[in-house]
Amino acid sequence: MSIHAGGLQVPVSVIIPAAGSGRRMGGGTAKQFLPLRGEPVLVRTVRRFSECPLVDEIVIAAGDVEATRALVGHMPKVTRIVQGGAERQDSVWAALQAVHSRPRIVAVHDAARPLLTADVLKGVLQAAADHPAQVVAVPVQDTIKQVGPDGVVVATPDRSMLWAVQTPQVFWADVLVRAFRQAIADGFLGTDDASLVERIGVPVRVYRGHPGNLKLTTPTDFRLAELLLEEEARQC
């Protein structure tokens, strides 16, 4: 359907980097292929976007292209599955080059976050129509300590100013492309896409998300996700 920005209908592309090995899960299967209540994690993640009327296309950067195509290539709005890279940043860049060339908004979302709610997705996409960089985030609940290499606390940041960043992270396409090109030129490797955009001086805004939008990293995360899905099913 696209969204309205500046009086124009702007197509929305979603990039899902899915080339991770999931080493922290143990075993030989990448976490995006592991079952979660009877369905692979990646299937659940892709469905969250394919069912969103604001999304026009989904591009996936995969470690195993053929296995990924067999799993989700038939799903609505999946237009391309490209080879991912050694780092997450490499995978996002590969997918970014594969999106359609029309002016658009690009949302980048972790393959291992299958619990994104429809309300948060719709809200952050609509917010991005008016601002070139939006990231889903939640306020931190724990006290955070900055610790030096010797294990001694250096500082205690003001918790009221700290947010835990999730995905999707949503950008105007030209801004994201410029940020990636600058990072490549500088040899910079960021921990998320927003850090690249911050480096080129574009303000990044937070859109309040939901704590249940977990990134599945450990077996404990999977158990918690199963409980959240059970609760979601009871509410339907």
Curated annotation (Swiss-Prot):
Name of this protein: 2-C-methyl-D-erythritol 4-phosphate cytidylyltransferase
Gene name, Swiss-Prot/TrEMBL: ispD
Catalyzed reaction equations: 2-C-methyl-D-erythritol 4-phosphate + CTP + H(+) = 4-CDP-2-C-methyl-D-erythritol + diphosphate
Origin superkingdom: Bacteria
Entry keyword annotation includes Transferase: yes
Organism: Symbiobacterium thermophilum (strain DSM 24528 / JCM 14929 / IAM 14863 / T)
GO biological process: isopentenyl diphosphate biosynthetic process, methylerythritol 4-phosphate pathway
Annotated pathway: Isoprenoid biosynthesis; isopentenyl diphosphate biosynthesis via DXP pathway; isopentenyl diphosphate from 1-deoxy-D-xylulose 5-phosphate: step 2/6
Pfam families: IspD (PF01128)
